[in-house]
């Protein structure tokens, strides 16, 4: 097959290229109990107090965990419009108390391979593809010879990866070190 023409899209990154990332702190968050064909079960009840990083739901099939991004009070668990599909799915509604109370430990420690993999699993990290495969499963009982860190933006308007690399460089490098430790043989 011979390449006959290259389609090049106009780059519009200048619209956000120099803009710092800003935090949008919502009054409410809605955490869907459905994603990638996985149904989640809430670990909370209405009026429960939630801290940032606290487990709020667990997957039925994969045991993947979902955590709260804010601290506050659970105000409802009912059907809301799910942006990915347009369908109504059960969601946990949490009213933000703006206190940022957290159960997350921000320690910079050197972890062993198995502990890093366990932390990935407990963090509920899944793949961004359609299957939502638990990331920790990719590291268990496997060795790798190469790590590719892809910092390229795939859209002509998007600069979020670029801005993260500029603004959170140390965290990115630390994360790469942890992944390298997790994949070592």
Feature annotation, model-predicted:
Residues 54, 58-63:
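N-terminal alpha-helical targeting/anchoring segments
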Residues 1-6, 13-17, 45-48, 64, ...:
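N-terminal start-of-chain detector that recognizes signal peptides
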Residues 40-49, 53:
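Short histidine-centered loop motifs in beta-beta connectors
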Residues 1-43, 58, 93:
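N-terminal, Lys/Arg-enriched amphipathic/low-complexity engagement segments
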Residues 15-20, 53, 78-82:
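Intrinsically disordered, low-complexity boundary segments flanking structured domains
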Residues 49, 55, 71-73:
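Residue-level marker of beta-strand positions
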Residues 63-83, 88-185:
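Iron-sulfur-associated redox domains of electron-transfer enzymes in respiratory
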Residues 6-8, 25-28, 47, 147, ...:
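Amphipathic, alpha-helical segments enriched in basic
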